[in-house]
Curated annotation (Swiss-Prot):
Keywords annotated in UniProt: Chloroplast, Plastid, Ribonucleoprotein, Ribosomal protein
Protein name: Large ribosomal subunit protein bL33c
Signal sequence, start to end: none
Organism, scientific name: Lemna minor (Common duckweed)
Record's keyword annotation contains Chloroplast: yes
GO MF entries: structural constituent of ribosome
Classification via InterPro entries: Ribosomal_bL33, Ribosomal_bL33_CS, Ribosomal_bL33_sf, Ribosomal_zn-bd
GO process terms (BP): translation
Family: Belongs to the bacterial ribosomal protein bL33 family.
Amino acid sequence: MAKGKDVRVRVILECNSCGRNENGVTKEVPGVSRYVTQKNRHNTPSRLELKKFCRYCNKHTIHVEVKK
């Protein structure tokens, strides 16, 4: 039997609000918060969004999956 593609894939989550203010204009920040995690491709086919702590914004923000 042949194995299919891996079900679990590694994804990178990036802060949605780092470097942006309410008008969508970029601002000076020291960096962008990123997390590396895994997701199950069968259970979560869409992009992953998790609320994580951003050390640059110094608060909990929504982190979204970035394309590789």
